[in-house]
Amino acid sequence: MLTLVPTPIGNLEDISKRALKALENAEIVFCEDTRVTKKLLNLYNIPLNKTFISMHSHNEEKVIKNLNKDDLITKNCVYVSDAGMPGISDPGSKLIQFCQKENIPYTVIPGANAALTAYVASGFEGEFCFFGFLPHKGKERTQKLLKILENDKISILYESPHRIEKLINELKEYAPERIIFLAKELTKIHETFIKAKAKDIKLENTKGEWVVVIDKGNKHKKLELDYNDILNLDLPLKEKSKLLAKISDKSPKEIYNELIKT
């Protein structure tokens, strides 16, 4: 049987007795990084007399293709990501799909998750959408962020310390009045919360992993971008035309035809 086991996102005490028992009884451990998982088990004084199989985003399909179905049925198998809940911005979903397809029994142990923890800490209320990490750069990033800002639900993102300032600057440009909640180093000693309008956010120390919670937009209100701002975005003409149509009385087709003539 397969058990998906969440691991702490920072504080080692944030793990359940059930999760520890599953790790202790495991015969096969699928994990993102075997070094990280072995270190974690050592911290909990759990013996390493198990088979460890590295399974991450780059080899997930290959590992599943070579799986011994009987092992998953007859042995105690667990999957853990490096931190948090498997399957949420981490591998795990494809392994579940394999179990569903092959009628292999599985279960999921509830536990730590950065997105939900940050949402609760934000004080925002209402429906929310989780978007994981944005594309690193280029028009794909811009397109994704603009769609998120047009969303009429609360949005939750993950961002790395290397790109958090870039994201804040983008939010200042596209939605300066939007309320943003930032959570850094959740559950750790230097846990930090910041809540302010995008235009007022100042980051003094960007080190650490970030969760960004963006208050919902108003679907009847246009993004805080003017015509020239959109023209200067690194987007395909069709996407620009759609955005420009939202702040004008022209159709996307009319604007597109105008743009291709310029």
Residue ranges and their predicted role:
Residues 54-61, 134-137:
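Conserved helicase motor
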Residues 35-37, 114, 163:
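Alpha-helix capping/helix-boundary segments
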Residues 2, 51, 76, 154, ...:
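A contiguous loop/helix-start segment that scaffolds small-molecule binding in enzyme catalytic cores
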Residues 94-151:
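Class I SAM-dependent methyltransferase SAM-binding "motif I" and its flanking Rossmann-like core
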Residues 23-29, 103-106, 154-155:
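Short active-site oxyanion
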Residues 32, 55, 80, 107-109, ...:
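Structural motif
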Residues 64-117:
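Glycine/small-residue-rich loop that forms an oxyanion/phosphate-binding "nest" at active or ligand-binding sites
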Residues 1-57:
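Glycine-rich, flexible N-terminal cofactor/catalytic loop recognition
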